[in-house]
Amino acid sequence: MGTSVQVTPLSGAYGEGPLCYLLAVDGFRFLLDCGWTDLCDPSHLQPLAKVAPTIDAVLLSHADTMHLGALPYAMKHLGLSAPVYATEPVFRLGILTLYDYFISRRQVSDFDLFTLDDIDAAFQNVVRLKYSQNHLLNDKGEGIVIAPHVAGHDLGGTVWKITKDGEDVVYAVDFNHRKERHLNGTALGSFVRPAVLITDAYNALNNHVYKRQQDQDFIDALVKVLTGGGSVLLPIDTAGRVLEILLILEQYWAQRHLIYPIYFLTNVSTSTVDYVKSFLEWMNDSISKSFEHTRDNAFLLKCVTQIINKDELEKLGDAPKVVLASMASLEVGFSHDIFVDMANEAKNLVLFTEKGQFGTLARMLQVDPPPKAVKVTMSKRIPLVGDELKAYEEEQERIKKEEALKASLNKEEEKKASLGSNAKASDPMVIDASTSRKPSNAGSKFGGNVDILIDGFVPPSSSVAPMFPFFENTSEWDDFGEVINPEDYLMKQEEMDNTLMPGAGDGMDSMLDEGSARLLLDSTPSKVISNEMTVQVKCSLAYMDFEGRSDGRSVKSVIAHVAPLKLVLVHGSAEATEHLKMHCSKNSDLHVYAPQIEETIDVTSDLCAYKVQLSEKLMSNVISKKLGEHEIAWVDAEVGKTDDKLTLLPPSSTPAAHKSVLVGDLKLADFKQFLANKGLQVEFAGGALRCGEYITLRKIGDAGQKGSTGSQQIVIEGPLCEDYYKIRELLYSQFYLL
């Protein structure tokens, strides 16, 4: 039978919640993304908590909180310990995203769900892969190959292909078919007939306007506000879609010579741009080629200033400016505070470039019509002074003493246990009873052997050892001296990273610039003070879709082109999910599933695949033809079962010669161009390809329909002339002949 495949949504099904799914392939359990909302509610992770200890591998697709926000918490509290796989940009920018979120939370609350050390620990052993790199899993996952492919949504964004026994499971969420300023379009269209496609219905009900028109509307909206004396706030993510917006602003500001300042404000903004400059090979072809020829880096931003605090903004006062500030949800971070400052002025604009997460302030402001007033909580962290500082220091001193005492007791217990177990073997004063009972040959007045048992010489476990303990380390020696261990001289992976990429170590210090690191490492005793207030929303509010996802029309087209055997729909509103499910169900050859959260569906392939061993003698007589990455050949055989193993038996009789088989998929449009290059006059007429004066090619059969598996025929009509044989020969050259 086919490879066993089960899918269980843990979050992000029939809703727009964070993405987290369990995929089991022949018993090997993948966690597809590990997202969390900016609200950080641990109760949302209950489905994940039930299965976290059983996960064998984690695959991360994008570097934002909706895809990896819960990873540190899951590894610290839920027992998740599986290896994590991601591309280099998702790894690097994912850490910066969580750093930014942690700092934003700590500045307004006593956030303790995870720490900076937890973030570092979660990403410490991430296996980083390149696009299209096949990675073979070991041990329990033997035979499974995973490979990341371009998603087109953000830098390093991934469509995962998981292959077992020739069957592909494709996980493609938040993909974008469009080529953008810094990204290529998704590679999803290159996949053909995967066994299972897991994709999202997020944009199933939405259709985009033309990108050029959208960019122009975006710039016009900004310029209109700036020329009117107002300022613009763009709530953005830390290191994802903000990169595309930065390039749009940089390009238009440079072309129009605009003087209004643009600020990129996050706790890690300078570090983000520095890293992005080194990821040119992950961007689209035009950026890479431009750098090769002119050494001009697209992210050497001249019109955008990166800042990590609000001091620069406060110097400008009410002067017109554009501020890109995290977080996009407006729950915490610089965007929250700047919104409160700007909301009271009608001349200002808050422009959202992505949908707000459910339950957040951003989503509340995006409803139609928007609220006229909102309640917000303003919090800030201030240093402790006076009696509060003294009480804090006394409490810290008490905690230190308790920890020191506890450590001392633990060390004493370990010493006691060690001495107790070795006392009998190492102390010469302890006399073994087995050696104390010796026969006496000298005789005694009783004329017999006397057994003398000496007891009471074992020192108590609490006593001090009579001498310092000494343990001799034994080493192996050969004719040339002491044998060395080559592993002691190997360069560690993180050290290699440091040599290949400046400042690219895995620790916090190497990930951040000096200013950001100072924010994180600030240990000044402080407290958080909060107060609720009502904000009158007088400023303009607008939403423009710069999320970098394919729209509904494109998603349907991509699914039809890929033509999976089974389709699993996740991450979309109930309306969008049902709409896309009904649309795809019209294809009778496609099985469509839309599971609820914690509902397990079996999408095992209906195909019967068996493993057979072919002898060298048989293979030596086989003529193979290369087809893409594989080789194909025709073999006549009888399959029988012996000793519970499938083996290839020799044929009982000489098989009849088989008819020639042409393998391939011909597109008439491509063949038309091919014939034109050969000097033939070709044109389409009535759905057929007219070649010269007399020859016509028609493509007939069920396989002409997208996703169908029926037979396909190409008919050559015309007299047996010189053109006929020439065109037939050229047609044969487009196929593999068996």
UniProtKB/Swiss-Prot annotation:
Gene3D superfamilies: Ribonuclease Z/Hydroxyacylglutathione hydrolase-like
Gene Ontology process terms (BP): mRNA 3'-end processing by stem-loop binding and cleavage; regulatory ncRNA-mediated post-transcriptional gene silencing
InterPro entries found in the cross-reference section: Beta_Casp, CPSF2, Cpsf2_C, CPSF2_MBL, Metallo-B-lactamas, RibonucZ/Hydroxyglut_hydro, RMMBL
GO molecular function, one term: RNA binding
Coiled-coil positions: none
Subcellular location: Nucleus
Transmembrane segments: none
UniProt keywords, alphabetically: mRNA processing, Nucleus, RNA-binding
GO cellular component: cytoplasm; mRNA cleavage and polyadenylation specificity factor complex
UniProt-listed Pfam families: Beta-Casp, CPSF100_C, Lactamase_B_6, RMMBL
Subunit: CPSF is a heterotetramer composed of four distinct subunits 160, 100, 70 and 30 kDa.
Record family assignment: Belongs to the metallo-beta-lactamase superfamily. RNA-metabolizing metallo-beta-lactamase-like family. CPSF2/YSH1 subfamily.
Function: CPSF plays a key role in pre-mRNA 3'-end formation, recognizing the AAUAAA signal sequence and interacting with poly(A)polymerase and other factors to bring about cleavage and poly(A) addition.
Designated name of the protein: Cleavage and polyadenylation specificity factor subunit 2
Organism, as annotated: Oryza sativa subsp. japonica
